């Protein structure tokens, strides 16, 4: 190789090196300025991570619990726990139960028999609420909505409500689909009829309390309203005249219920069901009655308007065609004393009915 060519080769190598250095500098500069896109697989991973982060629920900022009316009945327990669940979600907290005594365990067991999914949402502490909890009053009147959003700025890990009952759809109705999914799986409800393509079940929800609902203060169920109300519902809800309409009656006084309609069958396991049978009295547990409503009741009639059990039969029902006797047309003590606001207690999509002066059923708007 001649001495003449060597400088040229060195010059060429130098040019290549300088080009490489300059190219690396440009790449780093554009990367730092965000002008260069990362490789496709990196972008896909980054976008996926951002989507996952945006769809993850926020981390709860603590627990929400409440004093519970442990000596009350099943439907009152359901109201309290579902409302605490709804409020906890709205306040970005985990619903919790502090077990104060053995009655709390009975409460939990009773609700779990019909809404097992609801209890799965709760953190259950096997001891009373501790001193670290911030206690706040809410809903001093059972059936008037008290907006819990006022507690949004409380940062305490444990927020404990000292109200009771929380009987308003407004505490949880935006989570209605989820609440209904908490109902236990269907079981064999026979000899009660199931809702299928060949029949229509008009569900009468009767919760007659012979202990206190006939005390002259609460409005209890009575035949003079039930019979015309049922006929009214049949006319409104029967979409196909060829369908067989059946009525299932549920309540706390089977003897009374069995006498309302001729040919009524008390649906015990050994009961003989004729093809012509149209009226059934349930002999199931309250939990199974609620589950039956969820899977089979196309229409529901609540004849004792302040009955919380009747309320839940309607709210959990399959068909969501719920009718109730207008409480303003009665002398029910809860309404008269101002502890129940109909707009807070009754779901707006439900139909309020009453008897006019001619004993004709009319819709109350």
Curated annotation (Swiss-Prot):
<dbReference type="GO" id="GO:0008107">
    <property type="term" value="F:galactoside 2-alpha-L-fucosyltransferase activity"/>
</dbReference>
<dbReference type="Pfam" id="PF01531">
    <property type="entry name" value="Glyco_transf_11"/>
</dbReference>
<dbReference type="InterPro" id="IPR002516">
    <property type="entry name" value="Glyco_trans_11"/>
</dbReference>
<protein>
    <recommendedName>
        <fullName>Putative glycosyltransferase C06E1.7</fullName>
        <ecNumber>2.4.-.-</ecNumber>
    </recommendedName>
</protein>
<keyword id="KW-0808">Transferase</keyword>
<dbReference type="GO" id="GO:0016020">
    <property type="term" value="C:membrane"/>
</dbReference>
<dbReference type="GO" id="GO:0043413">
    <property type="term" value="P:macromolecule glycosylation"/>
</dbReference>
<comment type="similarity">
    <text>Belongs to the glycosyltransferase 11 family.</text>
</comment>
<dbReference type="InterPro" id="IPR052501">
    <property type="entry name" value="Alpha-1-2_FucT"/>
</dbReference>
<dbReference type="GO" id="GO:0005975">
    <property type="term" value="P:carbohydrate metabolic process"/>
</dbReference>
<keyword id="KW-0328">Glycosyltransferase</keyword>
